[in-house]
Amino acid sequence: MTMTDPIADFLTRLRNANTAYHDEVKLPHSKIKANIAEILKREGYISDFRTEDAEVGKTLIVDLKYGPSRERSLAGVRRVSKPGLRVYAKSTNLPKVLGGLGVAIISTSSGLLTDRQAANQGVGGEVLAYVW
């Protein structure tokens, strides 16, 4: 069966594993999921990610990050632009997540960027998700 929204599936698996205090999440690999994981690692929401060859295709393994007393570093995730309703933002009207404490992941012509990177480069695009 085909997956309608692989980005939402990725974010949901991350949220569920984080809520259950799992140390890692295994999910099907794709370039966009690896790019989102790279942004989450750079912003400090996950500790690391890697790709492994599976029997069929590749597997993306994301290592979740917790504080010293197991407090979650990933408080929340929300999918914004969906296959049925795409959400775009101009470079002058980029969203702020929790007044700048969170991160908006935006798909631009320059690749996947955070809201701050897109504002610095002066590009807009499709708002994929909010992470805080």
From Swiss-Prot:
Q: What cellular component GO annotations does this protein have?
A: ribonucleoprotein complex; ribosome
Instruction: Report the InterPro entries cross-referenced here.
Output: Ribosomal_uS8 (IPR000630), Ribosomal_uS8_CS (IPR047863), Ribosomal_uS8_sf (IPR035987)
Which SUPFAM superfamilies does the protein's record reference? Ribosomal protein S8
Q: Which domain of life is it from?
A: Bacteria
The answer to whether UniProt assigns keyword Signal to this entry is no
Q: Give a GO biological-process term.
A: translation
| Entry's Gene Ontology molecular function annotations | rRNA binding; structural constituent of ribosome
The record's keywords, sorted A to Z, are: Ribonucleoprotein, Ribosomal protein, RNA-binding, rRNA-binding
Name the protein family.
Belongs to the universal ribosomal protein uS8 family.
Q: How does it assemble?
A: Part of the 30S ribosomal subunit. Contacts proteins S5 and S12.
- Functional note: One of the primary rRNA binding proteins, it binds directly to 16S rRNA central domain where it helps coordinate assembly of the platform of the 30S subunit.
- Identification of the protein by name: Small ribosomal subunit protein uS8
